[in-house]
C-alpha cells in the first residue's frame, strides 16, 4: 500500500506498507525510517555501489519486456532480484538490499500511474536516493493521464544518479 501527500505536484510525505515483511516505510519530507510491527525502528541503509556491473538490480516479476531483458543482459548486473510492487522495489533500495530499479513502459502498453510512484519516490529521495526518467528529469505528477511512461530509473545515490542514467542511455542506443 502506498500513500503520499504531494505539494506543488511533487511527493513530499509518504508511506509504503509492506505487510509480508512487517515494514512500514515513512518519510516526513526530511528523513526516512522504517517501523516494524513490534515497534522497532531503523534508518535507511543505502549501498554505495557506483559501477552498474557492481549493482544489484530490482525489477518486476510481471512487467518485463524484451527491451528490458536485453538491457539487463547487456549491463550484466552483479545480481537481479525479482519482486512485486514499486513500493517493495524502492524499499529494497532504501533498506540496502538492492541498488537500482529500472521501469520501462512501452508505447501502447499499460504504464505505472502516479499513485504507484509518489510515495516510493518521496521515501527514496529523503533517504538520499534519486528517481527520474532516463533523461534525468524529475517525474511529473498530476497529468491528466496519471501515467508515468517511458524509462524510469531509481538509484541509491542522488550524486551518482545522473551518470548512471547517461550510462544506461548509451547502452540502449
Predicted regions mapped to residue ranges:
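A generic local secondary-structure boundary/capping motif
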Residues: 2-3, 44-47
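Tryptophan-centered short beta-strand motifs
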Residues: 11, 40-44, 80
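DPxDG-like acidic metal-binding loop motif
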Residues: 1-37
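Short linear motifs in exposed loops
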Residues: 15, 28, 36, 45, ...
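An extended, acidic
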Residues: 46-173
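Flexible, glycine-rich phosphate/dinucleotide-binding loops
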Residues: 23, 33, 41, 66, ...
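Short helix-loop capping/hinge motifs at secondary-structure junctions, enriched
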Residues: 31-34, 39-41, 158-164
Amino acid at each position: 500500500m502506498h500513500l503520499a501527500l504531494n505539494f506543488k505536484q511533487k511527493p513530499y510525505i509518504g508511506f509504503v506498507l509492506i505487510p509480508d515483511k512487517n515494514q512500514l516505510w515513512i518519510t516526513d519530507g526530511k528523513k526516512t525510517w522504517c517501523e516494524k510491527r513490534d515497534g522497532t525502528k531503523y534508518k535507511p541503509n543505502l549501498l554505495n555501489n557506483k559501477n552498474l556491473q557492481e549493482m544489484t538490480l530490482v525489477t518486476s516479476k510481471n512487467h518485463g519486456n524484451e527491451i528490458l531483458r536485453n538491457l539487463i543482459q547487456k549491463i550484466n548486473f552483479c545480481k537481479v532480484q525479482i519482486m512485486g510492487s514499486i513500493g517493495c522495489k524502492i524499499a529494497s533500495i532504501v533498506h540496502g538490499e538492492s541498488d537500482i530499479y529500472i521501469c520501462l513502459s512501452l508505447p501502447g502498453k499499460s504504464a505505472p500511474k502516479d499513485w504507484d510512484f509518489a510515495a516510493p519516490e518521496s521515501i527514496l529521495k529523503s533517504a538520499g536516493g534519486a528517481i527520474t526518467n532516463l533523461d534525468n528529469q524529475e517525474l511529473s505528477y498530476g497529468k491528466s493521464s496519471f501515467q508515468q511512461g517511458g524509462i524510469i530509473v531509481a538509484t541509491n545515490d542522488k550524486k551518482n544518479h545522473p551518470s548512471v542514467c547517461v550510462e544506461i542511455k548509451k547502452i540502449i542506443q
